[in-house]
A protein has these predicted regions:
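Active-site mouth of glycoside hydrolases
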Residues: 34-36, 41-279
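Aromatic- and carboxylate-lined catalytic core of secreted/periplasmic carbohydrate-active enzymes
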Residues: 31, 54, 294-298, 305-308, ...
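Short strand-edge motifs at loop-to-beta-strand transitions and within beta-strands
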Residues: 469-471
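Short hydrophobic alpha-helix segments
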Residues: 59, 463-465
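Boundary at the C-terminal end of the N-terminal hydrophobic targeting segment
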Residues: 23-27, 33
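Bacterial N-terminal signal peptides
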Residues: 9-21
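Active-site clefts of carbohydrate-active enzymes
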Residues: 251, 265-267, 286-326
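Bacterial N-terminal signal peptides that target proteins for export
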Residues: 1-11
Length: 503
């Protein structure tokens, strides 16, 4: 392919992508009035679907303080923008972390009367319902955290500690009240945990034990009974079995390690976080969860935030800098290609809606309005588009596609394909990298190879090869990261990321 042909091909691909994006945006607007179907676990146990059987790719955004820290106009701007940027779900909190009980919201509302979980303030919960409905109008689901974890673990967190093992009915009452207010909304799923472990008992984690000890908890502390009551209250309030996840503290302790067999837990969650350095091997944690029985979907609910300072605890060294868009892409692509049912993006200024009124923590470097247009935040839609442009429910992780060592840390490559061997994706985090792929893992006499740019969402055809052989590839000299897309030519798939396959 000469340079003129390749240039024409790239222009054509970009034009089609632009038109397709406009169609998707218009579709979201025209269907906004329709109730969104609920989400459930797909029959394979690893992925998600809507109640009417359509694929659901979890592309989340952390908006933890949306209910507490935004005006109506700000919330509308946030929801509209994230809807237009291709997100499918936002994560927010009812009883939020930072003074969410004692400080009135941006609308002047407190969630509880006299700090009593048995006395919810109806006006505050009216606002919760409004946000859920406005999210639906923008094509968004809401992953609702009823209770941030510090309301169980304070003074590990600002608290106050409202829910204890000796007042379990309070947790069930509060969850029931909230769920009953939302029982007619299909666009709500539930997240328990709120950045805290469900227990200290049996956790071989010195940091968690030290945090628990400093807050006055014994080493065998177990908050699981409280979360069971929350889950029970949600189910009773809804009148149906809900989709529930668990959001643990940062680190390799996925909810699978201590909650996997809980009947109320639908999806495992983990938090690779912001304090462990670059290139945390989240792909290994996803693979561990993926192999567990019975199968449950899993995902990283809080990777390194864009523009978050690198490990600011206890004191930040500015020389270490911030996590930027490249750091975010490396983590989200590799976790999804390792078998996750999706992934959550986050921006350090957006989760708390940092501005002059709300303040900020941990060296926020910009206002949340500006942060809504940061590179990685806009680029996440390309990951979703890529996944949805090929058969959705058939994808399985397969590192055997990569011949030899897949690399470690910042050089780690991650591969995924479909069960029929009609396509494969390989994420490459570095430029000028030589690597080989076993095309024998795919079916087809001829295999078409393309480079997919995760910064622009544009795919470029490289060449076509005979099937059944090993082929060496070389990543482009600019980037820095790329996705190699391999397709059975006979499948006649569209260019990667351009249109939703079979939807």
């Amino acid at each position: 392919m000469n340079w003129r042909t390749r240039l024409f091909f790239n222009i054509l691909v970009f034009f089609v992508f632009f038109l397709n994006s406009m169609v998707w945006a218009q579709s979201a607007r025209t269907t906004a009035a329709k109730p969104l179907p609920s989400i459930r676990v797909h029959a394979d146990g690893h992925l998600l679907e809507t109640a009417d059987g359509r694929p659901f790719f979890w592309l989340g955004d952390t908006a933890w303080e949306l209910i507490h820290n935004t005006t109506r106009e700000e919330a509308s701007y946030y929801l509209h923008t994230r809807g237009q940027q291709g997100y499918t779900i936002i994560q927010t909190v009812v009883l939020s972390e930072f003074d969410g009980i004692t400080k009135p919201s941006a609308l002047g509302l407190l969630p509880l009367i006299d700090n009593d979980p048995r006395k919810p303030n109806p006006a505050y919960f009216d606002r919760v319902v409004e946000i859920v409905d406005e999210a639906a109008a923008n094509g968004l689901y809401v992953a609702l955290v009823p209770i941030w974890g510090d309301k169980l673990t304070a003074p590990w967190g600002s608290g106050p500690r409202l829910f204890r093992n000796d007042n379990l009915p309070d947790a069930r009452f509060f969850a029931h009240y909230l769920a009953e207010r939302l029982k007619d909304r299909g666009n709500v799923v539930w997240i328990l945990g709120g950045d805290r472990p469900a227990r200290l008992k049996g956790m071989n984690n010195d940091y968690l034990q030290e945090m628990g000890k400093s807050a006055g908890f014994p080493p065998n502390q177990d908050w699981t009974p409280i979360w069971r009551e929350v889950a029970r209250g949600i189910e009773e309030g809804l009148g149906r079995k809900p989709l529930i996840l668990y959001h643990p503290q940062g680190g390799q302790e996925s909810s699978s390690l201590y909650l996997h067999d809980e009947p109320w837990l639908s999806v495992n969650g983990m938090q690779s976080g912001h304090g462990g350095g670059h290139d945390i091997p989240v792909w290994e944690w996803i693979a561990r969860d993926y192999a567990m029985k019975p199968a449950k979907p899993t995902l990283d609910l809080e990777p390194n935030y864009e523009d978050h300072p690198y490990n600011p605890w206890p004191d930040w060294d500015p020389a270490t800098g911030y996590f930027r868009d490249y750091d975010v892409r490396k983590q989200v692509y590799r976790s999804v290609f390792a078998g996750a049912c999706g992934v959550t993006y986050g921006h350090h200024a957006v989760w708390g809606f940092a501005n002059a009124r709300n303040g900020s923590i941990n060296h926020v470097d910009r206002d949340w309005i500006d942060a809504m247009q940061r590179p990685a935040g806009r680029q996440m839609q390309y990951l979703r588009a890529l996944v949805e442009s090929r058969p959705f429910f058939e994808r399985i992780p397969d590192q055997a596609l990569i011949v030899g060592d897949a690399g470690k840390g910042g050089q780690h490559m991650q591969a995924i394909r479909d069960r029929d061997g009609s396509y494969a994706f390989v994420y490459l985090p570095t430029i000028d990298t030589y690597f080989s792929v076993d095309l024998g893992k795919l079916k087809g006499k001829r295999i078409r190879a393309s480079w997919f740019d995760p910064r622009t969402g544009i795919g470029t055809l490289v060449d076509t090869f005979d099937g059944g052989i090993q082929v060496q590839f070389h990543t482009p000299s600019y980037g820095p990261d790329w996705v190699l897309v391999l397709d059975n030519e006979a499948a006649k798939y569209p260019p990667p990321g351009l249109s939703r396959w079979g939807m």
